[in-house]
């Protein structure tokens, strides 16, 4: 038994032990008293009390010890029976104990240094460390931000957290305004910036998903992401066609990965292969150029992954195969645009390096046209997988630099496959996901039954204001009820007039749905797992220490994307280069 448990037991039973010891002296007084009748015996005890208590030590006579033991045990039994049968009262909490959190509630979760925190509200923050002084205060860094249009999701939450500059950042940037306004601040804090622009391809770095394919598993993930986010509106029907497309795309991408040179591993080559796959319905023996490629592959590598997948696709009859090709062509139609082909020709983003040193990746997308948003989803899917694998394989399970994904307009980027599993596992790898939505129903529309799992893995949830009924209903229920005092008055008039007042207690929502709908524009509600909710002011961006480095403060700080992308890389004197003399190379 530990010392702590022993001390606790001693404190519990000490009063009864002391009473038992005192009762031994009472037993001695009773034993020394004379008298045959009970009354005479009791009267005689008055004279034996001084004798019995003359010695401060307890009596050790067997009869006295029995009386002492009986008194101590009897009192303990009486207390136990009373507590067991006692009525349970919760004074002031009869109908609910909900209340707003205060400074004392949030204090254990905040780091002393301002820059080592996630900014949640004006007065509440969450430490970045996954190992607080008290382990019970550990929380994951996933955040769910919900707010209607114009509620300040970007200004009051996303920008202040981006300016903290304590992690690498992946920022979904609708309209491309965030990088323009905050890019300069990040550069001055030593960040390397990377930009994928799906609005203006000429102001973007190149991104080639094929560059991150290293195994058959990666091929399947790439195909799944592509298929999931290029379904189109109202897609459904017979799953046969989708499964057939998956077979063909998997076969072609696998062939490019294992057989084609690196410069040909891209969507442009994939489209060229599809365009040469002519099918003649009335000639089953006809072989197109791709058929010949796979026939040659089967001779060299009979059990290749690409060959096995293509063999399954070729089981389709001519007319069916033609329909599959048409479906694949329609799915990859965006890549017929030359600018997009050029964008995905090679890779400059180096997604797997974001956890090595401080880097900010901005994913610029249109908030009105979702045509190219599937590229953003592909980036996130590959990013999560790459960083998790690198953390496990190279860094013992944790990245050197925490990577925070600030996913603004999360509902517009498409579906990230297995997001419900990722948000539950990325915490230990020093990765966090922050989902910014206009309403919770947006998440449910995309992820269906998995939406609740995703929300459940967000330890911090912030409501900035809105009027969507489902969001208001869920939030009001989660805030709970408090117990309030109410009184009724009655005034009876007539021949015998009377007046009365009745006081009673009742339950009332901490904030009802109608009160949430008219929440002050400067207020927000924070819910941190295991802590009372907070009704606080939104964080004022102008008070941030790095605000003066943004273009909001001074237009001179505006970040020029085109100028940054066209700059020449500065050569560091310590950089090492390998010089190859072309004349010394053997002839091809």
Residue map of PLM features:
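General secondary-structure edge motif
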Residues: 98-100, 125, 141-142, 229, ...
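Conserved ATP-driven motor cores of ASCE-family P-loop NTPases powering translocation/secretion/packaging/pilus
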Residues: 423-525
